Amino acid sequence: MFKSIQAVAKRPNSRWWLSAAAGLAFTVTGTINAAKAEDTIKIGILHSLSGTMAISETTLKDVMLMLIDEQNKKGGLLGKKLEAVVVDPASNWPLFAEKARELISKDKVAVVFGCWTSVSRKSVLPVFKELNSILFYPVQYEGEESERNVFYTGAAPNQQAIPAVDYLMSKDGGSAKRWVLEGTDYVYPRTTNKILEAYLKQKGVKDEDIMINYTPFGFSDWQTEVSKIKAFGSAGKKTAVVSTINGDANVPFYKELGNQGIKATDIPVVAFSVGEEELAGLDTKPLVGHLAAWNYFESIKTPANAAFIKQWHAFTKNDKRTTNDPMEAHYIGFNMWVKAVEKVKSTDADKVIEALPGIEAPNLTGGTSKMLPNHHITKPVFIGEVRGDGQFDVVWKTKGVVPGDAWSDYLPGSKDLDADWVTLKCGNYNRVTKKCGGQGS
């Protein structure tokens, strides 16, 4: 071809021929590139790699790369290799929406795995609905939501917050009578604490025995706040702290607990957003006995978990890298998505959304998780105590798996709502009015 172009170029009036030849070359190249692009299935990874949430989210990007690599070693999916497209929304909530749009519209990803905070999830929801794409969300959250385009593989409040309070109220958990609800100032802690406050009052806890406090993202000056907790806990009744603090603010919070000598035997703290990753950089000796509620702990001994940890260490080339609950949620969600795609032999969003409810995938703790019609999954619940090495000893667990409930039974505007995308095709069906479109609290 190139010899022909050179020959034509020496002739008079050859500009048209050159243009045509160049156009043909561009068309051929474009066709090759398009065919090349179609040879892969693109998967979007939407996690903060910088900013206040990087401490928690970077690991989720890494585990997705591992899962994609593993699937490619098995031969890919539908005869194609999987290709990760990684972006950094930088703990900037509006930027999450921009990056989600970029992944779906520009990069043409088939699915997105991402977000940690509820404010980031809320930011991207309109984009996924408008562009009809799929988001797998791997972190515990406040509930009060069920969207057609989202699959929630983290815990709903009935799979984490409520069981944690029940444990702390029990004799084994210390029979707590006073409660500090301490959280970061955004939608997840505020809604979760609204549910917990209603639940505690149903259990007979009085207003004066509930203290609620919020601090900004990235908060670091915990001396005054921890002093308030200490004072509240010195009133003669057993006091417990329920922590919905998110991101790197957890590090100075736990350091200050140690500085002020608050031991788990005095005022136990149960955390919903602190796991092995967040404790990795801390001196955990002063924190021994404090608690976390999750659906997975690295210390749980099963063949599946041992294999997962070994694979993780090999992939990261670092035996000190920990595993945690949201990583397991991505493991479950990714395998569910793969099964759904194989079932419908397509990555078409509508087909995959229809196929996902009913899909089962193994978890890492010895059981199976199932995607429910409300786009939440079944999960076991564990309460773990912090050990001196930054791991957790399981001190309590449910007998089996707990189905995720999208709408709280303890809030007036929510208790009559159901989410069912299989039969009702609705995420907020009101059982009283028999209509879709109910509003939660």
Regions found by a protein language model. Give the residues of each.
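Extracytoplasmic "Venus flytrap"
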Residues: G44-V63, V87-P94, W116-V119, T184-R190, ...
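Extracellular/periplasmic periplasmic-binding protein-like sensory domains
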Residues: E256-Y331, V341-T347, K397-T433, G437
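C-terminal segment of classical bacterial N-terminal signal peptides
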Residues: W16-S19, L24-A35
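Beta-alpha junction/loop-to-helix N-cap segments that form part of ligand/metal-binding clefts
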Residues: I55-D62, G75-E145, T153, Y214-Q223
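Signal peptide-proximal N-terminal region
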Residues: E38, D62-A84, G174, Q202-D207
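Extracellular/periplasmic Venus flytrap/periplasmic-binding protein
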Residues: E98, E142, N149-Q260, S299-A307, ...
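Solvent-exposed, acidic/polar segments of extracytosolic/periplasmic ligand-binding ectodomains
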Residues: I41, E360-S441
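Periplasmic-binding protein-like
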Residues: L103-C115, F136-P138, R178-G183, A235-G247, ...
